[in-house]
A protein has these predicted regions:
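Transmembrane beta-strands of outer-membrane beta-barrel pores
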Residues: 40-46, 70, 92-98, 150-158, ...
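Surface-exposed strand-loop-strand hairpins of Gram-negative outer-membrane beta-barrel proteins
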Residues: 44-65, 103-118, 259-290
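Residues on the lipid-exposed face of transmembrane beta-strands in outer-membrane beta-barrel proteins
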Residues: 64-72, 128-136, 148-152, 178-186, ...
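Repeated loop/turn-to-beta-strand initiation elements of outer-membrane beta-barrel proteins
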Residues: 75-77, 140-144, 188-194, 230-233, ...
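Outer-membrane beta-barrel "beta-signal"
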Residues: 216-235, 405-416
Length: 416
């Protein structure tokens, strides 16, 4: 994300200053620039479907966090004012998921898998995240809005055949973190304030390894904040940089990586205990590629919306065909698939976040397609477009079905 640029401004006249002081933004006491905080979270891990319900024993979670926030005061590029002077933050979160227990009890549903005599757990998850908090309402001693988080997480007890065999939530030590929350904050005195978040947090490996169920939790969070600065006032009369609405084309090419749910199901439930691959924690990764052509319309400084065509190349489908056809599968197989998608992008300076909702026009990935995929797909990610690159950009994202990762990708793009 980009920081606000500091500019000098001429002093306000007394009438203008009086008029300005009547606005909610200037009356707010939440404009001291730098804040440190600490807090606690207590919540529950969500059970997402009937399959997970069959082996979840308990879901209690708790945690602590420490963070630093920088409140945006003013910026001549206009983004700060457009987002109502947001806050940027860096937070270290430590979540204790020892109270989350998983265990498969004897059932014919598990095929050849032999239940074990202990419960599995994700242990603790440490996350280092960047956050963006946008105030929707700010006046006097109160501030309310929404916040988004992205970062990297480390899980102390991922899935392991030897000692954590029923942990299907976290498949590796290193995970991707995403969070979203609604928040309210109240000023207590000159420097202290309280902030409460109703937070949803997700960590997973983005289909880069198995298992890939992901850990989803609702975590009410309370933070005690301390402002390091004496005062700060947004310079709301700073002239904004000019902005011109307009349409543009963009082409993106990306490569991604994924593992196969077919490998997971085969080794978990269709492999005898005497086989070396029985309930293994070693999985092969497969490469995928994608090409996108989009027509977008930038109708506001911070937003663009449009329609795009997506072409996917998934050579792992040939591997599935070679495995499944000899077993009697009559499903269709193709390494190529395509779709169209509605695309929306939110900008702040050189960075943007995107979300796509697409529908396949054709896709044939074998007998597991109806179980593991949907006719529609989602894609979320972040993009960096430095001005000196003359329209070139780099992006990192995840494509998913029903919010479950299909692959994680890295790509380049060009717009004109």
């Amino acid at each position: 994300m980009t920081c606000a640029c500091v500019v000098a401004i001429a002093p306000l006249s007394l009438p203008a200053a009086q008029a300005l002081s009547e606005t909610d933004s200037v009356k707010s006491t939440f404009f001291r620039p730098t804040t440190v905080e600490g807090g606690i979270s207590v919540g529950q891990v969500l059970t997402m479907d009937r399959y997970q319900r069959a082996w979840m024993e308990s879901a209690a979670s708790r945690g602590v966090h420490w963070g630093w926030r920088r409140r945006t005061l003013f910026a001549p590029d206009g983004y700060a004012a457009d987002y109502n002077y947001p806050e940027w933050g860096v937070t270290l979160q430590m979540m204790d998921y020892a109270g989350v227990k998983m265990r498969k009890t004897p059932s014919p549903d598990w095929g050849m898998a032999v239940p074990v005599d202990y419960s599995s757990s994700p242990g603790a998850v440490f996350s280092l995240v960047g956050s963006f908090s946008r105030p929707l309402f700010r006046t006097g001693k109160w501030q309310m809005g929404y916040a988004l988080e992205e970062g990297l997480a480390f899980c102390t007890r991922p899935y392991a055949k030897e000692h954590n065999i029923d942990n299907e939530l976290t498949g590796g030590h290193w995970l991707i973190h995403f969070g979203a929350s609604l928040y309210a904050a109240r000023r207590l005195d000159k420097h202290w304030s309280l902030r409460g978040d109703l937070a949803f947090r997700h960590v997973s490996n983005g289909a880069t390894y198995r298992p890939n169920k992901g850990l989803n939790a609702v975590l009410p969070t309370l933070s005690l904040q301390y402002d390091l600065d004496e005062t700060g006032t947004p310079q709301v009369n700073v002239p904004k940089a000019s902005f011109v609405k307009g349409a543009f084309w963009r082409i993106d090419a990306s490569v991604g990586v994924r593992t196969l749910i077919e490998d997971w199901l085969r080794t978990q439930y269709a492999t005898p205990p005497t086989d070396a691959e029985y309930r293994t924690d070693h999985f092969k990764r497969y490469a995928v590629a994608n090409l996108q052509l989009d027509r977008m319309y930038r109708y506001a400084r911070r937003w663009a919306t449009g329609l795009g065509a997506d072409l996917f190349y998934t050579p792992y489908v040939r591997t599935l065909q070679n495995q499944e056809v000899p077993e009697g599968s009559t499903a269709k197989y193709s390494c190529w698939s395509g779709g169209i998608a509605l695309k929306h992008e939110a900008y702040y300076g050189d960075f943007s976040a995107y979300v796509h909702l697409g529908m396949y026009l054709w896709r044939h990935t074998g007998k597991m397609q109806s179980f593991d995929e949907t006719p529609y797909y989602e894609r979320v990610g972040v993009r960096w477009t430095p001005p000196r690159w003359k329209g070139m950009s780099v992006q990192f994202g995840i494509k998913a079905h029903r919010l479950k990762a299909d692959f994680t990708e890295l790509g380049i793009g060009f717009q004109w």
